[in-house]
Amino acid sequence: MNNLKKATLALATIVACTNTQAIDLVTKGDTTLSVGGYIKAEGVFSSPDDKDSDFEGSTRESRINFKATTLVSDKKVTGFIEGDFYGNYTGYDSGTPELRLRHAYLQVDHVTVGKTWNGQFFAVAPRLTEQLDFYGTGFGTIAGSGIYARPDLTLHYANKGFRFTAQDPISDDANLPDMVVSYSDDISNFGYTLAATARDANTGINDDLDTELGLGVSLATKLTLGKGSLHGSIYTGEGMGVYSGLCTTGALNPGNTASCDAENGELISQTGFSVGYRHVFTPKLRGNMRYGEVNIDNEADTSINIKSANLIYTYLPDLDIGVEWRDRSDTTLPWRQKGQEVEIMAKYKF
């Protein structure tokens, strides 16, 4: 029972974004309004395989959230809204940052409804290593794509490690929501999450938008060993490219979802995996190494992998300074080119 409580608490922590400490603004009776978020400044040195090297800086990942909690008939009701500054983002040269809605949901007991993380995210996120890369954090998992990580409408029911999710479908021709069922547990120093995804996936190209049932299964694990932890995940299925981030036509972008998972009118299977290691060197210094890969069983045998390693130093409470190296075997987004990158960042949480 204690292990189930730990798993449920870990997931609840992520959905409430409590990795960013909240500051209580107002408390009146049983109602509390708080503010949280972080400010992140990053500089990225890029060395693409097919282009000239460059350097770009950004603070777009910075975010702010407001949370209201109250008791109604002995039930805790939570409302949460959060935004960052990726509203007009098409690359580092996108111009003046614009506010973007990340989360807007309400939660009562075991039910959460609104715009928030999808079911695939919860199936892997608690078992991942810590990454600095805003795009590509979960590559190699069924939640590798950040494009559809937070559907406009999501319904979660979570209780004692079990989670059922119905979310706004990616396919415009879907007859039902995309659905995810998962179960999480922690046994001593080992934790796992097993999940199944079902969705109406497009099989056509351009105007031929017929759909078929796409099914996928995933397993994510974490093994704690002293001051370190081993992380691993694997998934396989058909119709999963819109969530993994890799399509039969290459890296996912919002314009190719209709043909993402199909070839010659048929859904194509794909398999992905990731392995990682996290180590806490001192109370202030920690590091992570990770490898993620996705392979598609299409005519071109499409495959992409990403390698990364980082060090993060807690300079002051709530103030982290970090550096991360990463290497992509192919382009994953127009602004995430094939080749190497080094990111240097500072992040203050409040």
Which residues are covered by each model-predicted region?
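Outer-membrane beta-barrel biogenesis signature
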Residues: 8-13, 19-36, 121-123, 138-141, ...
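Repeated loop/turn-to-beta-strand initiation elements of outer-membrane beta-barrel proteins
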Residues: 73-76, 110-113, 159-164, 189-194, ...
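Membrane-embedded beta-strands of outer-membrane beta-barrel proteins
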Residues: 62-66, 104, 153-155, 181, ...
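Detector for outer-membrane/organellar transmembrane beta-barrel domains
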Residues: 186-306
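Transmembrane beta-barrel outer-membrane domains
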Residues: 55-59, 94-101, 146-148, 172-176, ...
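Sequence/structural signature of outer-membrane beta-barrel proteins
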Residues: 44-48, 71, 85-90, 118-122, ...
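Outer-membrane beta-barrel "beta-signal"
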Residues: 223, 313-317, 338-350
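Outer membrane beta-barrel
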Residues: 23-46, 53-180, 184, 222-223, ...
